Structure formats: structure tokens, C-alpha cells
Amino acid sequence: MRLLFSFCFFFFMIIFTATAYDPLDPSGNITIKWDIMSWTADGYVATVTMNNFQIYRHIQNPGWTLGWTWAKKEVIWSMVGAQTTEQGDCSKFKGNVPHCCKKTPTVVDLLPGVPYNQQFSNCCKGGVIGAWGQDPSAAVSQFQVSAGLAGTTNKTVKLPKNFTLLGPGPGYTCGPAKIVPSTVFLTTDKRRKTQALMTWNVTCTYSQFLARKHPSCCVSFSSFYNDTITPCPSCACGCENKKSCVKADSKILTKKGLNTPKKDNTPLLQCTHHMCPVRVHWHVKTNYKDYWRVKIAITNFNYRMNHTLWTLAIQHPNLNNVTQVFSFDYKPVSPYGSINDTGMFYGTKFYNDLLMEAGPSGNVQSEVLLQKDQKTFTFKQGWAFPRKVYFNGDECMLPPPDSYPFLPNSAQGNFASFSLTILLLLFISIW
């Protein structure tokens, strides 16, 4: 029986990892589109567009890295809006030297502020791409590539293969390039349509299991009806960094350059029992007759990373009746149509859309007012706490259900007794 269970578990993990299925965003992906805009003497000029169709997962600093393998002996003569990280061996070329001669080029976005003649539309953001649900206009990145020693017709062009995408770390798996109907463009005066000479798409999906072996965030709970605070589970994000963590009152925090990110993105975490870079706290704050109020706080424990354009996705049955969100922006997420139990919180632009590194300013918070559905609302059995929590697209570890702040058994009895006492005093005063 144990052997059968183990087999089923590993089979499920393989399927889950291979399909990279996210139950709260089942159709989320990053689509990379190549549009050949013109032919050249020995190849073509193509516009490469990366569209992030993930509702609440974005690519943050240090940005995306795109790679592929050329099918033949192609080279990159030039690029606009991006660059390869290595030129490779171009010694066989005399006169004009290509931008890149590697069989497997690696491409990154340009940084903001580059000269105008190096810029392209939707480029030069340091590889940062917003989430589609947060801001569709920011969920795109583009560059132009001029390929040489390639085909010069639709029949002679060979599609690149073995696409890879880092965003910024591992986790994405890309499928093969597929020829699709040519993209149609509308001129600026909107009176004429043009189309690409040839178009192919590459679809990349994300799997948290491939990205890391431990969660990157955890969740803690508290409530007004119980003094118990349910903390994040111990070592929720693994304790590998326990030896290199820094205490909150350590003098090393005054050292200059402490917050400068490392090239390998090694974190510098504050010493905690959970050792997570980010903690989400859900506090059931107030109970009204027709409404109830929750306070959400996000705390950063990483001294070397801040989070731009952060997102927080939460699944809770009462999110179908959100009345007001006070300090965050909010959008409902309904991946299954009629089931409206998931929402995405994110920072208000120019106010709290940047979660600073660990320290006094390393937190953002907001309160949420929800209307009660009297048929389902209860404080019993942990109903008031979320079912799933995602920060920046990665699922956070929740405490075990038996540790949730419980509603005292005598709460309802005490309330009834209190109400009876008030009525009795009122009756005596009138009498």
C-alpha cells in the first residue's frame, strides 16, 4: 500500500511539474512571438514580443533572460532594444562583425536611459515585465533582431529551437516554436493594415516546483476573538540560510552597501524562526452586523531585495463580497467563471507599489471590508482565514489548520448572556 501511494505521489508530481498548472491561473503563460518584418540579403529582420499573460505573476529585477539554439549557422548582425550577453567567436568574419556568433545566444533587455538609437518600443526596462492582471500595458517587452546566414523566404527559414526563459530565476519551461498566422498591424492613422511576412510563437509556462525546493513566503494569522497569534511554520522556507542570517538589532545593518544585491541574487535574511524572505499576515480585526474587517500586512525580511510591482493573490469564499479595500488596489480573479472566491491585491502606483527591503520601511499593509453572506459566514473552524495565498505568483506556506486562532466555545453563550443582562437592566430601568 505504501509503495502504491509513493508511486501515485511521484506520478502526480511529474505530471504537475510537466504541465506547470496553476489552479488559480490555469491559462497563464508567457508567449514569445517572432514577426519577420523584412528580408535582408542573407536573412531577415524580426520583431520579438514577449507577452506576459499571467494574471498575478510578473518578472521583477534583474529581469528576464531569453535563450535559444539556432537551427542552422545563423548569426545576429544587430539588435535594437536588447543585447546578447556574449558575442562569441566571430573571427571568420572580415569587415562587418556580427553582434553575436554563438549557436546558443543569450539575450537580455537593455537598462532604462540608453540612447534613443538603441531603443525599441516596450524595451529598456531592465527586463521587468508586469503582470497581465495588474497592468496589461506593462506586461510586454519587445526588441528587434537582424539575423544573418538564415533563410530569406518563408520556405527556407528554419525556426530556432530549445528556447529557455529565466524570469529572473528558473521555473519556466518553453515549448517548441510553432508557425502561426501572420500578425496583422494597424498603421498609426488606423486606415491601413499590414502584416508580418512570417510569424511563429513560443509558449513558456511556470512551475514553482522547478523554481525552488522551498516556498519563498509564509502566512501567519491572528484575530480579535482570540489572543493567540498563529505564526508561520518553523523553517517554512527552509533553514539553509540560518547560518548567514542577520538579527534585527545587529550592528552589521549599519554597514554601507549592505542592501546592494549580489550577482547571484544570494539573499541576506533577517533571522526568524520561519526563515522566509516574505511574510503575509492576515488579521481578523472587527466584526459588524453586516460586515467584517480584515487587516493584511506584507513584511519583507530580505535586506538585499525590494519588490517592485508586487502582487498578492488570495483565495477566500467571502472575496465575492469585497466592499472596500483601503490602501491597496484590488481586482477579482475568476478563473472558473461563476466561482468568484479569488482576488489580487497590489500596490497603488507611486504610493505603495514598492515593497522596500527589510527594515523599518520593509512592509505594506491595508484593511479590507467585506460584506457578510449570512448563509455561509462564520468564525468557526477557521472559515475567516484564506485557503491559498500567493505572493508574486508563488504559493506561500500556510500554518496547519489545527493551529488557527479558534473561536472560544463559550463565545456564543457569553454573548447571549450579555444580551440577556442588557435587556434585564433595560426592563428594570423602565419599570
Swiss-Prot record:
It comes from the Eukaryota. One of its GO terms (biological process) is plant-type secondary cell wall biogenesis. Belongs to the COBRA family. It comes from Arabidopsis thaliana. Residues 1-20 form the signal peptide. Residues 415-431 form a propeptide. The gene is COBL4. It is a lipid-anchor; GPI-anchor. It is found in: Cell membrane. Glycans are attached at N29, N154, N162, N201, N226, N306, N321, N340. This is COBRA-like protein 4. A lipid is attached at N414 (GPI-anchor amidated asparagine). It holds the Pfam family COBRA. GO terms for cellular component: plant-type vacuole; plasma membrane; side of membrane. Expressed in roots, stems, leaves, flowers and siliques. Keywords: Cell membrane, Glycoprotein, GPI-anchor, Lipoprotein, Membrane, Signal.
